[in-house]
Amino acid sequence: KIPEAVLRYLGNHKDLGIHSEMISDGIVDLMKKGVINNRRKTYHKGKTVATFCIGSQKVYDFVDANPHVEFYPSEHINSPVKIAKNDKMVSINSAIEVDLTGQVVSDSIGYQFYSGIGGQVDFIRGASLSKGGKPIIALPSTTRDGKVSRIVSHITEGGGVVTSRGHVSYVVTEFGIASLQGKSIRERALELIKVAHPKFRDKLLANVRKHYWVPEYQESSPSSVPELGTIEMKRFNFANINYMLRPLAPADERKLQEFFYSHNKETLMMRYNHHI
């Protein structure tokens, strides 16, 4: 559902390309608008390529004898090496839960199987290998009723890891983006707590403290900041440069240290009138 929802917000983009397992109504709509033209693809240029299609009748009518659409077996479309031939490949996959090390469960709820694994691992790996690629796991921060966090301290008993923590680079919820690539377990846990629902953050942090993944002094970030209008992130443009303004989060501790370490003694005294 999340990948399909993303398509609805791409109407103002241009020159997009598709290399996917599935063609759906959302892709057809963007192709008809000219948003998807595959002009800049570096593999299968000018073609939307997939393994199968599913959707309303308009999908089947659109792909029938369409010279701009090609279907290939899954061993071709899902090959990470072939996926990676597309520069700036963005792979967006959903998940049922993600633990604080970055392990992704996407096919089961505990012992109950919910779906198959599909091509998630293939496309996450392919996007990771792509020049400028972005492998993304996206999910709501809670279950539909809001009672259970989907960012969890440990995987639900019986749940299976589909995508390992070694392959996950970005996890996205409605509360932001957790960047995991190259991060330690401590940094990963703090990044993921940052994008969990605010009402679950303290509990998640307490659990990782218990396992000594983070120091005892570590605190969670505030759930809202009045200075920003109770939002957690704001984007703006100044002098033709894009900026992102957000509160400092626990995951930023090392960046803050490096910021201070970059100052010489004169700067420290002039800025803070104190040795740091």
Label every model-predicted segment:
Residues 1-219:
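Conserved phosphate- and dinucleotide-binding cores of soluble alpha/beta proteins
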Residues 217-235:
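Long, charged amphipathic helices and adjacent flexible linkers at domain junctions
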Residues 225-227, 252-255, 268:
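Nucleic-acid processing machinery
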Residues 227-229, 247, 276:
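Edge strands and adjacent loops of beta-rich recognition modules
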Residues 237-239:
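Secondary-structure boundary/capping micro-motif
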Residues 242-258:
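A short beta-loop-alpha structural element at the N-terminal edge
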Residues 264-276:
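Conserved GNAT-fold acetyl-CoA-binding loop/helix
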